[in-house]
Every structure is written in C-alpha cells, then in structure tokens.
C-alpha cells in the first residue's frame, strides 16, 4: 500500500458490555476462553487496533437488533467526540417503532 491510499473501515462497532456479553457472541467468548467480560473496553483499544491495521477512519455504528439496543447512539457520539478525526457515526433505531425511530433520527442529527 502506498502512503496516498487511505483505508476506511465502513462497518465497525466499539463493543460495550451488553454487546460483548450478548448470547450471539457466546461461541466467540468460549473460543477466546472468556466466560464474561466484566470491565468496559476503552475506546483507545479500538483506535490502537485501527492504527495497527493502518485504518485512517472508521464508520462506527450503533446497534439496535431484534432484542433491543446493544450499542446506543449516545455511545457512538461519545466515541466520535473523543476521536473526531478517526470516527464517523452511523446511528441505529428500533425499526419496529417507526415514530420513535423518526424522533431518534431527528435527535441524532440535531443534538449528537
């Protein structure tokens, strides 16, 4: 890769405890020999991994799945505030509640 090429990760999450301890990641935790993660992972760990992979920017995503919110829009906004030159945010909403979703999109655009 030459120095003029830029790497952008277009789908990333910075895991919080709800996300990493969710049942969908149970096999990953078993494979890693981890029963349950009990301490928050600092966002600096994600930035460090980006540095190691020569990723200049990441589109960091909130996550609202069928079981509810796992990574909030506010958490994504906090990561962007800490590292504005490294992250661009992608919000998430509860698609099963369309009016709440519209209000949340407006909140994200106007306040976050």
Question: Where in the sequence are the language-model features?
Answer:
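Helix-coil boundary/capping segments in enzymes
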Residues: 1-112
